């Protein structure tokens, strides 16, 4: 996946945002200090609140739990969730109640949920750049490892994987894919009822809406600042006009929307829909390998780029097993764990590491083989709008179309 950035937040600007912190951060721990963290972690149980909507991800976390238990004596419990916002509410309530041994030790997070926890001082840290494995993170090539939805991370969450909005279709049904949001409207008009997107606030649905917002605004500068009512009103004029034109041509005339991208993928596989969407550029290749999609399915990204980001793990300020959580975060960043996560036979989630920083033996863990269904021509990753835009955008969408 490329990590070129375009338009308002250019690659040069993104690099500038992180270059000032390329030196070893003030909070970096010595080897002795890290050994003390590992010693205190032994025997702890880490309750990792993470989305459970994928069998592959669940299986990966089971594998990680076994490795962490054997190597570090830390028990990893996957608390399966469907909505990270609910975890944020729980941590907020526990902190307000003065509970110092909270029920959440680690949470899979990014975007608006990270922004909320950061603003409300609900996060432990900074800790991320003190992790021994952080030295291999590609902070220059993948600037979103330090900038989360235009919000500086500041060591309060550890990068875990990369994501970029990607579409896929069956070449037998869609020989030429629409490569822009304008082309998507033309495609929907030509193929009524065969296109849709998940209902916001589903993550993939909100991402589709944000992609349209970004693409339809020639001047994107306001999107990368904290949202205001005036900025929201101005920036969404072309968005609502576009969606008003698009929806009558969607599945069920835009009166109903599927609840998830998984549902859309199944409907596409069954022939009911023509195009599906994902935030994992390797998802179609995964599904082809598992015989759940035809090998005539191909993946693509829009010509002007698509939204891309990093997903992270963070430790709540009242976590009971802070040392154990740091050990887990460090393991998840290790070359062995990142390589297994990137393996299409396992999860297929792109790595946050700079492979050229690794010794040859660890670099060899990462496969360079191209498989059917992978993105043939990766496009630039466009930075996500500031996290403060998400909630008001979703609320306005629901008011208009929900």
Regions found by a protein language model. Give the residues of each.
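Extracytoplasmic ligand-binding site segments that recognize negatively charged/polar headgroups
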Residues: 51-63, 78-86, 103-262
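Conserved C-terminal helix/tail region of periplasmic/extracytoplasmic solute-binding proteins
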Residues: 33, 266, 371-402
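Extracytoplasmic/periplasmic substrate-binding proteins
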Residues: 251-314, 357-365
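Short beta-strand->loop
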Residues: 124-137, 157, 185, 289, ...
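N-terminal secretory signal peptides
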Residues: 1-26
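Mature extracytoplasmic/periplasmic domains
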Residues: 306-307, 311-377
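C-terminal segment of N-terminal export signals and the immediately downstream linker at the start
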Residues: 8, 25-44
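Short, polar/charged alpha-helical segment
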Residues: 34-42, 49, 54-75
